[in-house]
Regions:
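A feature for loop-to-transmembrane-helix boundaries and adjacent hydrophobic helices
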Residues: 1-181
Length: 181
């Protein structure tokens, strides 16, 4: 729809809408091109790159929290946060901190434990675990996160764009783990 009619809007990063999903796809494409150019093994580079990626996600989600972005749905839980501004004066789930912990700390710890296994796991395993882990966490967190205003809910209010984009990540990650060489 909209982007077919306005293709240059895809690059309007000042309008928001930047997503980890798109960044991951771009990173993979760029990484594969660089690996081919320098004759490097793409699976090895991908596995090395994703070991520290959860820490970057953790810092990014903490920045989202500090900036009052990507807040959660209203809650009556004692740790609800009042963000003010467009979020209003009601306590909300600190979904950014949930993501920082699960996508960041927990996923980093899982990858660290796996990196110490002997013998070494097959190439592509770490990439698979990272992609699948991110997809699972993001899919679940979307239940307590306010969907992007410009997208809302899809498929008759059943699913968010974040959830829809996370499902292929779970499948791709699982496939990478199963078929790792």
């Amino acid at each position: 729809g909209y982007y077919w009619a306005h293709p240059l809007e895809i690059f309007a990063t000042n309008e928001g809408g930047m997503s980890f999903h798109g960044g991951l796809v771009g990173g993979i494409i760029g990484g594969v091109l660089v690996c081919r150019m320098y004759k490097l093994d793409a699976w090895t580079i991908a596995d090395l790159a994703v070991i520290g990626a959860p820490l970057a996600l953790c810092l990014g989600r903490c920045a989202n929290f500090v900036n009052g972005e990507l807040w959660g749905k209203p809650t009556d839980l004692p740790w609800g946060v009042i963000f003010g501004g467009t979020a209003g004066d009601m306590p909300r789930h600190p979904s950014q901190l949930y993501e920082a912990f699960l996508e960041g700390i927990v996923l980093f710890c899982i990858l660290q434990v796996l990196s110490r296994k002997k013998p070494l796991l097959p190439q592509g395993t770490f990439m698979g675990v990272f992609v699948m882990g991110y997809g699972i966490v993001r899919f679940l967190i979307e239940f307590v996160r306010v969907p992007d205003a410009q997208l809302g809910y899809l498929l008759g209010g059943v699913i968010t764009m974040g959830q829809l984009l996370s499902l292929p990540l779970v499948i791709a990650g699982l496939a990478l783990i199963i078929f790792a060489r």
